[in-house]
Amino acid sequence: MTTINQLYSRLISAMGVEDLEIPMTAVKFYKKEDEIPGPVKENQPTISLTSCQAAKQASLGDAALLTTDNIGCVAAAITFGLVDKDQTEPLGDSRVYTDIMRDQSGLGDDFKPPSPKDFTEGNVYACKDSGNMDFALFGKEDVGRFKDVETAKKAMKDMMAIQPPTTKGVFLYSRDFDDIDIIPDVIVLSVTSAELTRIIQAYQFNTGERVTASMGGLRVVNSDLIVRPYLTGKINVAPYCLGARLIAEFEADRMGIGMPFSIFEEL
């Protein structure tokens, strides 16, 4: 049994609820200078996946190595440090998130996907104010996720990201992945409010420390639940965002809690 499976089993046993299962995703970052193990490379998707899709699929037993070649969300590519936030070239022709834009734009082959810089400058999230309705997700009536470009840029300043980019790949995998015993950097649990209460109680029992949640309405899986715990070394709690609900189909009664592996070990 792998290390994370042992720790997960201990957590579930401590909950004392018969047949309880809490969806869990383990996350491992590989930097540009790292050698990615063969069994991990074997789980590199040949189609694009958003980070929230990869996280959801991992919680169901799958695994996915996300790289610049297959990540389906430009925002997540920025957050994970796979690309520079000011890159002016689009990631590629077909990505899950930008394909939605292409479909609603009606432009077909004439559609040009937004670049990382378009996201950084607020042109995507404030598509109406920036005059870029091609970047809308919900047709002509879509005003974007923020009222104007300045508000979008302000919000993005608080969305933690690994910048400048230093990441070669991000591996999201299930507790059942046992080709090799990988120690993850971050653990994400998809919890009900009652399960969240028990986990916070367990953390406080050992540390006496309160948990402060920092959350936004976008980039919740990649930024709030994965990169924020990775960079701060602290737990974070956040509800799943629009993309996670619509694209990855996270359940309405669940939210996420992300934590460094070192904290998960002590629960």
Could you describe each region identified by the protein language model?
Residues 4-267:
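Acidic, serine/proline-rich low-complexity intrinsically disordered regions
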